[in-house]
């Protein structure tokens, strides 16, 4: 499956000057919500991702996503894997498990995002689950922006990667775009970064 074509066809590969939820600026933005608004395509992508995970022979009992961006991807992945799904969300800027969701002691959980940039949100989600006794066994995403090391990719982890090196990150593709710290962003000379993502919006 050509993941880049899926994003392009859904008009979900945006070009401009963007402020990512990680804090970096970039000339490209992946709007996964546009891809996932098609239920059949969402199912196909999740099945492809589930195949990678199943081939690794991991014991996964639950998928958890940080709201809002990861919810659709996580739910479809959980359905493809045949396990339950829960999500964490921010309350007063602190990631929290609410809505009656519970985790069992040593429950094996995969944390799923739509896009992984630095993995900061995924790690906030993982920390909440670990504090409640769960065991994080892997991370997943539809796409990886190339900062974190993806399983089966030749690319190495880059500066700013937050995910632990001993746990696998499963994603369908690496999307490697230029990213800049706000203090050294060349795009800021001609335009103001816009924030199309879900954190804070």
From Swiss-Prot:
On assembly, the entry states: Homodimer.
- According to UniProt, the name of this protein is Orotate phosphoribosyltransferase
Pfam families registered for this protein in UniProt: Pribosyltran (PF00156)
**What keywords were assigned to this record?**
Glycosyltransferase, Magnesium, Pyrimidine biosynthesis, Transferase
The residues the record assigns to binding 5-phospho-alpha-D-ribose 1-diphosphate are 113-121
Protein source organism: Helicobacter pylori (strain J99 / ATCC 700824) (Campylobacter pylori J99)
Q: Where does orotate bind?
A: 117, 145
According to UniProt, the reaction catalysed is: orotidine 5'-phosphate + diphosphate = orotate + 5-phospho-alpha-D-ribose 1-diphosphate
Report which superkingdom the organism of origin falls in.
Bacteria
Family assignment from sequence similarity: Belongs to the purine/pyrimidine phosphoribosyltransferase family. PyrE subfamily.
What pathway is this protein said to act in by its record? Pyrimidine metabolism; UMP biosynthesis via de novo pathway; UMP from orotate: step 1/2
Q: Which cofactor does it need?
A: Mg(2+)
Give the enzyme's EC designation: 2.4.2.10
A GO molecular-function annotation = orotate phosphoribosyltransferase activity
Which GO BP terms sit in this record? 'de novo' UMP biosynthetic process; pyrimidine nucleobase biosynthetic process
Q: Briefly, what is this protein's role?
A: Catalyzes the transfer of a ribosyl phosphate group from 5-phosphoribose 1-diphosphate to orotate, leading to the formation of orotidine monophosphate (OMP).
PROSITE patterns named among the record's database cross-references: PUR_PYR_PR_TRANSFER
Annotated PANTHER family: OROTATE PHOSPHORIBOSYLTRANSFERASE, URIDINE 5'-MONOPHOSPHATE SYNTHASE
